[in-house]
C-alpha cells in the first residue's frame, strides 16, 4: 500500500511502540494506586516521561506536564481555564476545530474573538498578531504549523509580543512537535499541546 496521509495521521509506528504497548498491557500496574512493584514501576515510568517531555519543550519542570486523552482535550482545557467572558482572544484561520470550536463557544458567552486571515502566500506575519492586540486582549491561541498549507508561524516573535503585553500564549503543536524546535521558555509559551499521531521516531520512542 502507498500511503499519502502521514500529514494527518502517521500510519507506520516504530517497532518500539508496539513493544511498549505490549509490555504495558502485560506488566504495568495502576500508577498511584499502591506500593507494590508494578504500581511503583508505572509511577516511575510516567515521571520519567514527564522529564523527557519537559526537556524536549524546555518547560518549567516535569510537574507541569499533564497527560490527557488527546490534543483536543488539552487545548479545550487550556482555553477554558485561561479565557473568561469579557476577554479578547487572537487566533487564526489555520486552526484545527479543537481550537476554533471552543473559541466560537466562548464567543457566545462574551469573549471577543479576532481571527487572523492568511495573506496571498498562505502566511500570517508576526506583525499581524501585534496589530490585533487590544487593551482587553487576554490570550493568543495559535497553531505552530499547518499540515494544509505547510507553513509555520514564528513563535519567537509572537511570544515576544505576548510577553510585552502580558498575554497568555497557547500553542497547538500537533503538527510540529518533534519536528520543529519548540522552547517554551524562550518562546514565552504558557501552554503547548501535541499528539503522537503525527510524530515518527522523535516522540514515539520517548
Which residues make up each language-model segment?
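Pyridoxal 5′-phosphate
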Residues: 1-201
Amino acid at each position: 500500500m502507498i500511503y499519502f496521509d502521514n500529514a494527518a495521521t502517521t500510519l507506520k509506528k516504530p517497532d518500539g511502540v508496539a513493544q511498549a504497548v505490549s509490555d504495558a498491557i502485560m506488566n504495568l500496574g495502576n500508577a498511584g494506586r499502591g506500593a507494590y512493584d508494578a504500581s511503583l514501576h508505572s509511577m516511575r515510568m510516567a515521571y520519567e516521561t514527564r522529564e523527557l517531555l519537559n526537556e524536549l519543550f524546555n518547560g518549567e519542570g516535569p510537574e507541569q506536564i499533564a497527560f490527557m486523552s488527546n490534543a483536543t482535550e488539552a487545548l479545550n482545557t487550556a482555553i477554558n481555564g485561561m479565557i473568561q467572558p469579557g476577554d479578547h482572544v487572537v487566533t487564526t484561520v489555520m486552526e484545527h476545530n479543537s481550537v476554533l470550536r471552543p473559541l466560537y463557544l466562548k464567543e457566545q458567552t462574551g469573549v471577543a474573538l479576532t481571527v487572523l486571515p492568511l495573506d496571498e502566500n498562505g502566511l500570517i506575519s508576526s506583525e499581524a498578531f501585534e496589530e490585533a492586540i487590544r487593551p482587553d486582549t487576554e490570550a493568543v491561541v495559535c497553531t505552530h504549523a499547518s499540515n494544509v498549507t505547510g507553513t509555520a508561524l514564528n513563535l519567537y516573535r509572537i511570544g515576544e509580543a505576548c510577553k510585552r503585553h502580558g498575554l497568555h500564549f497557547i500553542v497547538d503543536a500537533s503538527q510540529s512537535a518533534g519536528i520543529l524546535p519548540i522552547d517554551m521558555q524562550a518562546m514565552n509559551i504558557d501552554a503547548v499541546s501535541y499528539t503522537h499521531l503525527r510524530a515518527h521516531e522523535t516522540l514515539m520512542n520517548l
